[in-house]
Amino acid sequence: MKFLLSNDDGYFAPGLAMLAQTLQRYGEVVVVAPERDRSGASNSLTLDRPLTVRKAANGFHYVNGTPTDCVHLAVTGFLDFRPNMIFTGINHGPNMGDDTLYSGTVAAATEGFMLGIPSVAVSLAGHSGKHFASAGKVVEQLVERCLEEPFQQPVLLNVNVPDAPPEEVGALQVTRLGRRHAAQPVIKSQNPRGETIYWVGPVGAVQDAGAGTDFGCVASKQVSVTPLMLDLTAYGQLDRISTWLHR
């Protein structure tokens, strides 16, 4: 198999190194990742300047752009082959519920899916960063399952792995996205010149972590696998909005 890898933590991130190390056992691996941390970049593309691709000492390619730039550039012009699968991550921190809308890791996988390639975003759902090997084991399971029964059409999967030793990580479970409460207010401060500055505040507390959610799954030390889709249409509101417009 031929794999394209990317992330949003930057080409130097330990999670990306673990992902590459894991997938090299199964085929050809090419890494095209941002030159710096682009967490929270979501699906943004760089349109106001050209992009450059450079090669690091470890063989990874890095781009002066967003995670979505990396995958788009790689698939549509940089690579001389079409990847069989795209993996993004292993993200240092969870990407669950509403987080998926902001995540560059999920966005990079989404770009691959939009280009017709099965794509998987993988995150280590904790901030200690101690157990990337556990996420690597999960990637192995997913690839081996794909080898046994390949996807017949492109899929987009969001995978969150508990930040725990491999022996403590439970089975893979198919989940839906949970929800958070609204984010906390921005943090207002001053720089040394006395100018007012703002930092984006912490994420909101978990609101929906019930049965079947990604939050609930990871809290029980199981692996959350959430199939994602791109259609944002609120079908349940079509009739109501139509009535409102034409009343």
From Swiss-Prot:
It is found in: Cytoplasm. Transmembrane segments: none annotated. One of its GO terms (molecular function) is exopolyphosphatase activity. Its main location: cytoplasm. A divalent metal cation binds at residues 8-9, 39, 91. One of its GO terms (cellular component) is cytoplasm. Nucleotidase that shows phosphatase activity on nucleoside 5'-monophosphates. This is 5'-nucleotidase SurE. It comes from Chromobacterium violaceum (strain ATCC 12472 / DSM 30191 / JCM 1249 / CCUG 213 / NBRC 12614 / NCIMB 9131 / NCTC 9757 / MK).
